[in-house]
Amino acid sequence: SGCCKHPACGKNRC
């Protein structure tokens, strides 16, 4: 889990 650093992660981005 955590945040994603690329736009494909959608609303789970940093």
From Swiss-Prot:
The keyword Ribonucleoprotein does not apply. A non-hydroxylated version of this conotoxin has been synthesized. Hydroxylation of Pro-7 seems to increase the inhibition of rodent alpha-1-beta-1-delta-epsilon and alpha-1-beta-1-delta-gamma nAChRs. GO terms for cellular component: extracellular region; host cell postsynaptic membrane. Belongs to the conotoxin A superfamily. It comes from Conus purpurascens. Alpha-conotoxins bind to the nicotinic acetylcholine receptors (nAChR) and inhibit them. This toxin inhibits rodent (alpha-1-beta-1-delta-epsilon (CHRNA1-CHRNB1-CHRND-CHRNE)> alpha-1-beta-1-delta-gamma (CHRNA1-CHRNB1-CHRNG-CHRND)) and human (alpha-3-beta-2/CHRNA3-CHRNB2) nAChRs heterologously expressed in Xenopus oocytes, but has minimal effect on human alpha-7/CHRNA7 nAChRs. Has no effect on the frequency of responses from the giant fiber (GF)-dorsal longitudinal and GF-tergo trochanteral muscle pathways in the D.melanogaster GF circuit. This is Alpha-conotoxin PIC. Expressed by the venom duct.
